[in-house]
């Protein structure tokens, strides 16, 4: 089955869609007038998501969107693109009868910024089967997300599907004016998800780490002060010890010379 002519985009979370994103979304409609367009919001997300348990445990929009894009494509098929991707020309040529098309942001490195798939594609089925709730397996939240439902998961699964089409970086990530002339889209990397819930969560984590660092430094400061005080006390006690009379000291030095 081929990739159906549907463009999916997701906007979830408490904040309204920023103005630049509205223009980038419109660019996809402009270059694909005959295609169906779906902007998924909180109000029309799947009522019975396959990974409902995982979604319920995720609070950050970026985390939920990573899972939802897989599920939407598995159910409906089509092309998913992030809202900060600006379309430059039609996708018709790059799809060309394929049933799955991945996008590379670096040679051999797959991104989930844009994905095209036929409904029910086995790669997406496997990806959804491997999605786990975001428990604390990783210290770095970003790396945890990439592995659980993001680019690293796709990158690993693609190895078992050698026939899928992978677009080279210049198609969606042009780095020169010459590459842009032939690119399908350009990624503005607005990282808008990180301006809301994710940013607040990151700030809370940073505050906790800062508080731990402050506590550790305070403990070290107290230990240093106690050590300094103890050394001063020992030096004070040493100075209080009576010194032997001068004659006794001279006799001792003379004895040491004779011993040599």
Question: Residue spans of the language-model regions?
Answer:
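Small-residue hinge/turn detector
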Residues: 66-78
């Amino acid at each position: 089955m081929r990739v159906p002519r549907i463009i999916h985009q997701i906007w979830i979370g408490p904040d309204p869609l920023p103005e630049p994103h509205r223009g980038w979304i419109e660019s996809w409609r402009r270059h694909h007038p005959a295609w169906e367009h779906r902007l998924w919001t909180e109000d029309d997300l799947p009522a019975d998501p396959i990974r409902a348990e995982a979604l319920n445990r995720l609070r950050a929009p970026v985390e939920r969107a990573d899972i939802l894009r897989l599920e939407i494509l598995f159910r409906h098929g089509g092309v998913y693109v992030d809202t900060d991707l600006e379309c430059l020309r039609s996708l018709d040529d790059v799809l060309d009868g394929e049933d799955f098309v991945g996008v590379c942001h670096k040679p051999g490195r797959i991104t989930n910024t844009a994905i095209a798939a036929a409904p029910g594609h086995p790669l997406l089925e496997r990806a959804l089967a491997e999605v786990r709730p975001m428990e604390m397996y990783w210290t770095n939240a970003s790396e945890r997300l990439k592995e659980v439902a993001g680019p690293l998961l796709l990158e690993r699964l693609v190895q078992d599907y050698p026939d899928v089409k992978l677009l080279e970086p210049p198609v969606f990530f042009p780095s020169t004016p010459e590459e842009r002339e032939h690119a399908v889209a350009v990624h503005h990397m607005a990282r808008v998800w990180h301006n809301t819930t994710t940013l607040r969560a990151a700030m809370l984590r940073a505050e906790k780490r800062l508080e731990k660092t402050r506590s550790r430094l305070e403990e070290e400061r107290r230990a240093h002060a106690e050590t300094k005080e103890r050394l001063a006390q020992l030096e004070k006690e040493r100075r209080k010890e009576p010194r032997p009379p001068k004659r006794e000291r001279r006799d001792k030095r003379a004895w040491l010379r004779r011993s040599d």
